[in-house]
Amino acid sequence: IAQALLGDPEILVLDEPTAGLDPEERIRFRGIISDLSQQKLVLLSTHIVSDLEAVANEIILLRKGVVLEMQKPASLLEQLNGQVWLITVPAADEAALTKQYTCSNVMHTDGKSVIRLLSKSAPRPDAVPTAPNMEDLYLYYFGR
């Protein structure tokens, strides 16, 4: 990255720049990327969604070289409003739901599973809608 900056380019392309960094270094490096973006165009290729949340002003989603979306993060997330749900079930019922739906997280507590999943409509009457995040967005476009 230092070598790429030597020529003071107008466009800086970074491919997975925080992969392998510990959390403290990742945070520090995101600050550097953010500072650089004030002076030049920074293109960031990453599958680490927290990097996008921290620094992206605009997101381009690509699949096999084809642009699927190009929008501000908030606009992309708005598309998923009403499609992300939390369901609390006995731990024994978890497998059936995670097989049937795209699941972005499972938390276990007191013999129960709190499942975060994507579905265009409420998967069950007890499902509670929740705000989408970047991981949900990633799974929506690139998950199963």
Regions found by a protein language model. Give the residues of each.
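Hydrophobic anchor residue at the start of the ABC signature
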Residues: 1
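Conserved catalytic motifs of ABC-family nucleotide-binding domains
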Residues: 8
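Catalytic Walker B motif of ABC-type/P-loop ATPase nucleotide-binding domains
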Residues: 12-16, 21
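Helix N-cap at the start of a conserved alpha-helix in ABC-type nucleotide-binding domains
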Residues: 23-25
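ABC transporter nucleotide-binding domain
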Residues: 29-117
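C-terminal coupling/interaction segments
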Residues: 105-144
